[in-house]
Regions:
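Short intrinsically disordered, low-complexity coil segments enriched in acidic
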Residues: 11, 19-22
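Charged, compositionally biased N-terminal leader segments and the immediate start
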Residues: 1-15
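A polyanion-binding, active-site-adjacent surface
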Residues: 2, 17, 24-249
Length: 249
């Protein structure tokens, strides 16, 4: 196992031991907070579920810091401005996973903030949620040059970070946005057109594949299919789309 992957696994194991011991918070010095801030660690919205569990931010922050310092893909390291780790509710029931950051995401350090991201936000709102209610991430944490498709070795290098996010967030449902996200998790070769709209399973978590918002910008007619997929997701979560969204189908 690569040294970085081993470090991530050991970090997660140590945090799980701390949680099992009954620790509910960790004192952090102002100097440590300053270092985390300068490292580009993005804020994560927490939801207190009243169970006394260790806050998810304390679990995710070390993994995010490792990703921020990662140099495993030299070409991506040379081109990136920011590592784009993830954003949202670290106790979310619903997690969206895309392909990789684009130019806007690389500049701002947050996933899905460009045109495709704005469309994703509208989809989330149509589902009766806000971005702060869900968790959003990509397979790759760094932007590929010219927004090219991620290389297999880049996906392999970055996948441990995504797996750690899934393990710590423990979503009830994952939406895979596009073929890259789906193939990274399920190791399948079928296209997204054939697989979308059907349930698959990843480590006992249901996965719904659907078209990437960037595809919808090029093919607006496919929005109807994506909305059908999102209604299926809501049903899996035991929810319904808001009445206004239903009327606009």
């Amino acid at each position: 196992m690569h040294e970085l992957h081993q470090i991530i696994d050991e970090t997660i194991a140590a945090l799980e031991d701390i949680k099992r011991s009954g620790v509910t918070h960790v004192e952090v010095s102002s100097e440590t907070l300053d270092r985390l801030s300068s490292a580009g660690v993005s804020p994560v919205v927490l939801r207190d579920n009243g169970t006394g569990e260790t806050p998810a931010l304390l679990e995710i922050a070390p993994i995010e810091a490792r990703a921020d310092a990662c140099t495993m893909c030299p070409e991506l390291v040379r081109c990136r401005h920011n590592v784009v780790f993830g954003v949202g509710n670290a106790r979310a029931e619903l997690m969206f996973i895309g392909e990789a950051p684009g130019a806007d995401e690389d500049a701002q350090g947050e996933p899905f903030v460009g045109r495709a991201g704005q469309l994703l936000t509208k989809i989330i709102q149509a589902m009766g949620c806000q971005r702060e209610d869900v968790y959003i991430a990509n397979v790759l944490k760094c932007r590929p040059p010219e927004n090219r498709t991620p290389l297999p070795e880049e996906v392999a290098n970055c996948l441990p970070y995504l797996l750690a996010q899934i393990e710590l967030i423990k979503p009830k449902v994952i939406v895979a946005l596009g073929a890259t996200a789906l193939r990274a998790l399920l190791d399948v070769q079928l296209g997204i057109t054939k697989m979308r709209g059907n349930w698959y399973n990843f480590r006992d978590i249901p996965i719904m594949p659907t078209f990437h918002p960037a595809y919808l910008l090029r093919n607006p007619a496919a929005k109807k299919e994506v909305w059908q997929d999102m209604q299926t997701v809501l049903a899996k979560l035991g929810r319904e789309a808001p009445r206004r969204a239903k009327s606009e189908e």
